[in-house]
Curated annotation (Swiss-Prot):
It comes from the Eukaryota. It is found in: Nucleus. Residues 606-619 have a biased composition (Basic and acidic residues). One of its GO terms (cellular component) is nucleus. It comes from Paecilomyces divaricatus. This is Agnestins biosynthesis cluster transcription factor AgnL11. SMART domains: GAL4. Residues 76-103 form a coiled coil. Keywords: Coiled coil, DNA-binding, Metal-binding, Nucleus, Transcription, Transcription regulation, Zinc. It holds the Pfam family Fungal_trans.
Amino acid sequence: MKRSFDASHGQLEKQSRPRQVPTSCHFCRTKKLKCDRRFPCSNCRARRLSCVPFSDRSQAASLDLPGAGPSSTVSNEELSENINELKARLQRLEELISVNAEEKLDSKGPTSFVTSKGGYGEDVEASKSMNSLEMDAFEHQPLHSNSEERIAQLFASSFVSIIAPAIRLVIDQPTLSLLPSRKQAERLFDYFADQVVVFYYFIHVPTVRSMLDTVYTHLENKRQPQHDHLALLSTVFALSAYFGSSSSRFPFNGAEAKMLCYRWISVAQQALCAANYIVQPTVETLQSVILIAAYLVPNLGSMSIFRVLMASALQGALQLSLHQIDSPANQRRRQNATVNWVDIESKRRIWWHLASTDWIVSFMSGPRCGTYMIHPKQMTVDLPTNVDDQDIRPAGNYAQPLENAPTDMTFSILRTRISVIFREIVDAATDSGCLQEELPYDVVLAFDHRLHGIMADAPACFRTDPRSSRAPSRSPDLRLHRLIANALNRLHRPYLARGARDPKYSYSRMVCLRTARSVIELCKEMTGANEEFQHVKMWTIVHPLFNSVLVLVMDYCLNREEPRGDERKAEILEGFRLLEACQEDSALAQRGLQQMRQLLKGSASARKDKNPIHGDTDRATPPGSSNLPQHDKSSSSSPAPPVWPCLWTDPDLAPLETMDFDVDLDESQFEVLFRDFEGRHPMY
């Protein structure tokens, strides 16, 4: 029995032994880490531990006991020093953040809707403070600046200053106190619904009006409003203050209106960040961003921010699957189910505004010329229904014929149809392997016919012919004519100079001059017909005005021998006076007017230097005599460099009557000016 016991015991002992001695250290084998088997290994060196081979059981066991050896004591002391150092750094960071936070908080009122339970209040304040610090570092300007240019900078920095805290941010009481009272808010919203929203109608006015009542009920009950709703309403208030500074509805003047606009845009920016509008977009945050991009930012001269905002809105719309609203799967889900048609129509309006804007911008000069981001075959969205907001019914059968009396959505639908033509022009240029300026003339005439067809088929109130029943006081009805006139001008402009020399292209010259003169007349009518709304602040009105004046100047300079020279000068001066009246409220008008003066002034100086005694006015001007860079027409595909530096702080305010239009300029110099100007401000 003893022999059998010893034999079995030996077999068990043999089976329990590993096939080879472990070569990893004790720490790596215990923690199941990959050991590089260099004693000390990298894991132990990083943790400042004693590295002991696993085969040395006795020394490894001593490491498991607290205070078992001097190496363990040294390791604990070093770890304590590291922890103390980290605590000191954290304390210094908290001190810096707390100083910044105390400057922003109002000591008289409640500081936040968030309590300090669980450290959440500190997390919110730290995130907000870091947000402000990062914005200041990014913009290199003090955050308390109240200039209107700060509006664009706020939204530029908002894309790099969003911090993801442990909980969702809230809007503190001092920020909420910047909002107008309920009575003032209702007045501002009524002005927005009457005067502003008609230009780009992608919201549902009754829904936003109900939203206003809900938000102010929450504020009166000391509750935190929904952030995306607050962002949209703050944007509405800001736009009403911006465009209604001359309105009799409001007591504030121009300077106070700018201050209020900046204040409420700042609230909207904070609400958008609190709503996490990039990661978690909603219909309301999309509407807020598009309103700011469409109405405000371009007029302040920040086209790069406009492109960023529109791109972010497009990404948000894709996240919400707005491009598949009417896909077969979604249509099947809506069958025999309760459908919120107001929500469906609002999403259609947002998507088609983004798509039409994308296609129109692709038709204009600039970095986006000839390319668009939204492909029509990659979306399944019906056009918005031609219906007034209050007529949207639960049954879904509320569409109105487009030829009948116009509704809230009529212009938006017509604008979308025009954008489809623009997209097809871009596709035609791509298929032909040429630039838009090089389209065959028969293709240009075909698209010209289609644009005129849209105007002819539009409701009578949108037409400008004498037989139409348009009311002169309803300036928004002129939106369609302005858009088509600028499109025809852009389409025929490459043939403007040739139209005076070759009868084949005389139609293009006639179209350019006729549309330019009609735009100037419409701008005069719009600025004088409605004192409640400052049209000079709409960049989509100032841009066609500048293009029209530039076409008249170009035609005069290239064809000075033609009769009625005094009349042609007079209409040019009239256009300049309109631009001069706009430049105080429009950076676009100021920039365009200064560029035009610089062009004429430089060319006149070159002509006088060439022959100061006899005043030679020969049209044959050497390329080097102009102050503008000359461009080879064969290499028109390369981007045009800047024409000249714009000195905004010192504009040329010489009297218009002293401007010299008898200058020697060629077609390429005007094309450079068109490209430079439209590259900064594409029309849509």
